[in-house]
Amino acid sequence: PLFALILYCLLTLEALCYKASKEKKEWGKLLENLFWVGLVGALIALIFALTQAKKVLKFSEGTELMQKLAASIRKGANAYLKRQYTTVAKIFIIVFVILLILAGVGMLDNWFIPFAFLTGGIWSGLAGFVGMKIATSANARTANAAHESLNRGLNVAFSSGAVMGFTVVGLGLLDVSIWFHILKYIAGFEAAQIAQTMVMFGMGASFMALF
């Protein structure tokens, strides 16, 4: 998934920077710059997603019948999400507890691993929630806009799709950037330990995506 790809790219870039740096001060400065680039990029992506969502919601949902159909779809989608996330939350708690036990008996590298798995799932679930909300809000608006003109319909459709896309990228970058900062500057981990821990973030996100 995209979360895992972002993680891989950041760690690869980290390794290249370390290899290219001859002095420790330069290495630290490069890492600090990378952290801020990732964080700023995440915020830009999330802000852009918000602006696109507001843009979509400004369009009309069309006739009264279209609005009723859209409301029924949203109601069904909300019921589905509630049932799905309730079930998935129970599974995540079980896996999280198992990982905590494994960390407690020394079978995992560190105590951050269970929490990395958990946050990966939470961010992935949040991205899915946003995607479902914007999709069910855009369907009638897209149909109504397409009735007026093809270009207008495509405009609504692409804007709603951009909300989900940039939300996934923004949340992924944000979580990776925060975890990298915690593991590198607070916990003092080396690159290998960071990679082992942050892989669980990707696993948590992927595990959530299975449902």
Please name every model-derived segment.
Residues 3, 12-13, 22, 75, ...:
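Alpha-helical structural elements
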Residues 30-211:
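Hydrophobic, small-residue-rich transmembrane alpha-helices and their short perimembrane loops
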